[in-house]
Amino acid sequence: MRYDEHPIPPHEPVFQISIVARMIGLHQQTIRSYERIGLVTPHRTAGNTRLFSHEDIERLRTVTRLVNDLGVNLAGVDVIMRMTHQIEQLQKELEQTRAERDQLRGGTRH
């Protein structure tokens, strides 16, 4: 089930590590090691409990697919995840630039 099918906002941290581990079929220690190397960054409560959002869970699922299905090592996963994020940011900037261009074109035609 995807995070966008839930009434909880995708970025809201609500799931404890034990729940996340069961949801995606990973050992809690594996999730902790992914956190240590920066592949996922869960929210921490005042009591230092990890809370994961739907976005975090999707990220962990992506990491799991890359490692288990494609045989990518963790350093490679990190590079892929960073590049994917950069591409998403560039796509957003491109969309914004195109919208601004279209506004300018629309304004000069009148």
What spans do the regions from the language model cover?
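A periodicity- and composition-biased signal for non-globular, repetitive helical segments
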Residues: 38, 50, 56, 65-67, ...
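C-terminal regulatory/oligomerization modules of transcriptional regulators
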Residues: 1-7, 85-110
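Residue-identity detector for glycine
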Residues: 25, 38, 47, 71, ...
